[in-house]
């Protein structure tokens, strides 16, 4: 568990309480059902795509067999066995096994944290005493309610597809809906149990001013904390148990995005989630407070790392101290507003008319059309014509700049970064040229710096031409070495 400073005893109480709850009362039937359904779904998905497994999945299985023993029956046999065995295992047997693992002997209590003068840690005796006290706390059986209501209780009348045509280059079906949304459908047979979705709209974080810079730093982490519709994030996970489906909205530098995937059998659920994230985002102050507390604790510890200070200094040097380029810090949370973030989210996703939804995978066009008409053609639209604001993109510092940064390290080392920037036309030829340049530099640096000079374990390089702002180009080389070299 991640613990707030000064609340080690509370965290220990919570851990011991939940362990004791399992020991005394076991898991509930609904908890077990969800876990079992999820396991069966995972095996089903692996079985359906058994002819598309990557080499590393076989390699990893052979390595496990060599190091740990066991069997390699193959997914066909494994799926058949799990399908037969899992439904026959009662909750009582699972609880009996779980309770047999929780005893009063061979218990290890581990506590780690930063070595800071203002943090007081308990002694070994105090920690053991707190643990014994926590075991005596009253524990009630776990109670939960799992909603059986539909994800969307009431739907509007379906919309219509205004136009359907075939893209001559890729053979995809392109639909234009009567609310302006475009939908691209491309059937592939690479994976039988997967449909991928991506949706984009021009705009993005550059449409927000300086007062929202700190809010943007956690925007994508926060917007789905509360779940969607009538379901909290926790309840939504329960409802989606046994389904291979995921959906996540986000904002980028110059776009709003919705990404997701689903098995063909769960495609309707994917469309329902898309509809909910556009029309019924949900706030949860308690979930946000928990997120904020965790982040502040993590960031305070992170800031003790000298290499983080090095990275911060590098970012300031490259982007001329532009606040939009800076990473999030613990102090930023003093300016971050959860209600404002949700306002920003609703503002960006209030108009779906300029979104393009692309679906790729095991798609049946006739089967997907009713979902498109019901869930996408009914999304709210305002007819806004937007594009990103390149003036709000952090500009790379011009001219030559040298910064020598010193910080004490337990293991002394020197880190050297060379960064070059410029402008180059954004096209396929230049992108490929930049990629090949990076690969050539990797080979040269490996031979000259690592092998011939023995100056480092390796050199990291990158070369990139951005599409937004168009043509912004940079080349970077990073090396860690002995200060004497």
Regions found by a protein language model. Give the residues of each.
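Short Ser/Thr-interspersed hydrophobic loop/turn segments at strand-loop and sheet-helix junctions
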Residues: 441-442
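M16 family metallopeptidases and their MPP-like homologs
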Residues: 1-24, 30-87, 106-113, 184-186, ...
């Amino acid at each position: 568990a991640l613990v707030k400073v000064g609340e080690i005893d509370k965290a220990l109480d919570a851990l011991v309480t939940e362990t004791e709850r399992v020991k005394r009362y076991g898991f509930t039937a609904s908890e077990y059902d969800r876990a079992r359904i999820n396991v069966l779904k995972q095996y089903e998905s692996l079985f359906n795509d058994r002819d598309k497994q990557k080499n590393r999945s076989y390699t990893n299985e052979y390595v496990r067999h060599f190091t740990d023993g066991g069997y390699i029956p193959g997914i066909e046999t494994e799926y058949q066995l799990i399908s037969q065995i899992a439904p026959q295992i009662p909750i009582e047997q699972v609880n009996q096994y779980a309770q047999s693992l929780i005893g009063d002997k061979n218990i290890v209590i581990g506590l780690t944290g930063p070595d800071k003068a203002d943090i007081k840690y308990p002694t070994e005796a105090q920690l053991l005493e707190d643990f014994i006290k926590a075991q005596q706390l009253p524990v009630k059986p776990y109670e939960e309610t799992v909603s059986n209501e539909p994800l969307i209780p009431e739907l509007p009348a379906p919309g219509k597809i205004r136009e359907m045509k075939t893209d001559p280059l890729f053979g995809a079906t392109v639909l234009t809906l009567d609310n302006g949304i475009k939908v691209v459908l491309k059937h592939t047979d690479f994976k039988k149990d997967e449909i991928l979705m991506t949706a984009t709209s021009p705009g993005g974080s550059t449409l927000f001013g300086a007062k929202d810079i700190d809010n943007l730093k956690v925007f994508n982490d926060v917007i789905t904390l509360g779940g969607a519709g009538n379901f909290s994030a926790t309840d939504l996970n329960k409802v989606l148990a046994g389904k291979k489906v995921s959906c996540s909205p986000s904002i980028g530098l110059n776009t709003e995005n919705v990404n997701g995937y689903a098995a063909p059998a769960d495609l309707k659920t994917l469309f329902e989630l898309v509809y909910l994230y556009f029309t019924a985002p949900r706030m949860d102050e308690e979930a946000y407070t928990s997120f904020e507390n965790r982040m502040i604790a993590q960031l305070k510890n992170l800031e003790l790392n000298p290499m983080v200070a090095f990275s911060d200094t590098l970012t300031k040097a490259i982007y001329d101290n532009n606040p939009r380029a800076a990473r999030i810090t613990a102090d930023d949370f003093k300016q971050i507003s959860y209600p404002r973030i949700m306002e920003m989210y609703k503002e960006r996703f209030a108009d779906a008319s300029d979104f393009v939804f692309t679906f790729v995978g095991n798609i049946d066009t006739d089967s997907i059309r009713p979902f498109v008409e019901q869930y996408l053609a009914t999304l709210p639209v305002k007819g806004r014509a937007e594009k990103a604001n390149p003036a709000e993109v952090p500009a790379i510092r011009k001219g030559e700049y040298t910064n020598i940064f010193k910080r004490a390290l337990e293991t002394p080392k020197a880190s050297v970064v060379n960064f070059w920037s410029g402008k180059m036309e954004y096209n396929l030829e230049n992108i490929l040229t930049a990629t090949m340049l990076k690969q050539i530099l990797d080979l040269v640096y490996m031979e000259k710096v690592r092998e011939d000079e023995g100056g480092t374990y390796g050199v990291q390089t990158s070369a990139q031409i951005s599409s937004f702002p168009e043509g912004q180009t940079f080349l970077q080389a990073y090396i860690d070495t002995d200060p004497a070299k």
